[in-house]
Regions:
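C-terminal motif of bacterial Sec signal peptides marking the signal peptidase cleavage site
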Residues: 24-27
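N-terminal capping segment at the start of a domain
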Residues: 33-78, 88, 302-319
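Second-shell loop/turn segments in exported
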Residues: 40-48, 63-72, 99-102, 144-156, ...
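A non-catalytic alpha/beta surface segment that caps or lines the substrate-entry region
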Residues: 56-119
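Solvent-exposed loop/turn segments at secondary-structure junctions
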Residues: 67-69, 98-101, 118-120, 130-134, ...
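Active-site-adjacent substrate-binding region
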Residues: 96, 106, 224, 231-340
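Acidic/histidine-rich catalytic neighborhood of metal-dependent amide-processing enzymes
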Residues: 146-247, 275, 279
Length: 340
């Protein structure tokens, strides 16, 4: 009886040991899979984003003046953006067309597509708009409503971050996937607040609408997209925009985790934001590429939930913060270099 009990105990010990080993292998397998899928959780990766460089790129765009549609400043800045991307080894495709504004105005438009390793797959899409709003229609002074916006934040900042990422990609030349940077035109020619009619609802993001319906390459696809809108403002914090969560919630999770890993969780808050009509909508609904919008939310700002300078004459370099540029740029780099 004693031997039988001892044998039974020994068998039980072996059974439990084998079960433990099996569970350990399963756990390791799951951990390995989780690490692969959510590798942004592990540690900072990729080159250091240079906020001073991004700030300079922002300034250089503003030096042309407001880049409003059909203006000389717009045309000159277009050439500068193309040349800057080319100088960093990007293959550039200018997608030119004539769009129609809400008021019937023909708008000479150029979407600028700059590709890192254009023949490589998979691809990631990073985008921003580069035009300036023609009217400061949210300015507290009504006398400024028909003046153009310099668009240091609402335009130049997103392009500046993309240019600095492109420069960093060329410098390290180790990213094992392709990246397409798209500068969308005619985003900010939307229906002004001082108009008395009814906004038809599709007057914004005209360049993105055109690109989504007329892809720069037949059959173009990307694993996902990230839109950078107003990513240089003072006091900016980025909430999780609701339509981004609807169309690409897994990408929202990925980007916000990446921000936490690189130390910018105080900029990327785990809070729900409102839904925004922006360039990411046609990318999602027409091009069928899951795309999120990194856009600030100021819940306590009386002037606008987009911040105090939005669509005002004060959207200038005096209100650009290198810390915000750094937080966004380093987060996007973390996302890119975490991909497998």
């Amino acid at each position: 009886m004693e031997m039988t009990q001892r044998n039974s105990i020994s068998k039980c010990i072996w059974v439990y040991y084998l079960l433990f080993i099996g569970l350990l292998f399963v756990s390791c397998g799951n951990l390995r899979k989780q690490t692969s899928d959510n590798s942004v959780l592990m540690q900072p990766v990729g080159p250091v984003f240079n906020a001073d460089s991004a700030y300079l790129f922002c300034q250089q765009q503003c030096d042309f003046g407001p880049r409003t549609m059909n203006s000389q400043a717009h045309d000159a800045c277009e050439q500068w953006i193309v040349q800057k991307f080319q100088s960093y080894g990007m293959t550039v495709i200018p997608q030119k067309t004539v769009l129609t504004g809400y008021d019937g105005m023909p708008l000479r438009s150029t979407n600028i597509i700059a590709s890192y390793k254009p023949d490589l797959t998979p691809r990631i899409l990073i985008c921003a708009h580069w035009d300036s709003r023609p009217w400061a229609d949210n300015d507290p002074d009504e006398a400024n409503w028909h003046k153009p916006v310099m668009a240091a934040n609402d335009g130049a900042s997103g392009v500046a971050v993309m240019l600095e990422i492109a420069r960093a990609l060329q410098a390290v030349d180790s990213l094992a996937l392709g990246v397409d940077f798209i500068c969308f035109d005619a985003e900010d020619y939307g229906y002004p607040q001082w108009e008395t009619g009814i906004d038809p609802g599709n007057t914004w993001a005209l360049g993105a609408q055109y690109w989504a319906a007329n892809l720069h390459k037949p059959g173009y696809n990307a694993r996902y997209g990230i839109l950078l809108d107003m990513v240089g403002g003072q006091g900016a914090q980025f909430y999780q925009e609701s339509q981004s969560k609807q169309y690409a919630g897994h990408i929202v999770d990925k980007v916000w985790r990446a921000a936490s890993v690189v130390g910018y969780g105080s900029f990327f808050l785990m809070k729900d934001g409102v839904g925004i009509t922006d360039d990411h909508i046609p990318v999602n609904t027409v091009a069928k590429i899951p795309c999120i919008d990194i856009i600030p939310h100021y819940p306590f700002c009386e002037q606008s939930s987009f911040g105090p300078t939005w669509h005002t004459v004060n959207d200038d370099m005096a209100h650009i913060d290198k810390n915000t540029l750094q937080a966004v740029g380093q987060t996007v780099i973390q996302v890119l270099f975490s991909e497998r």
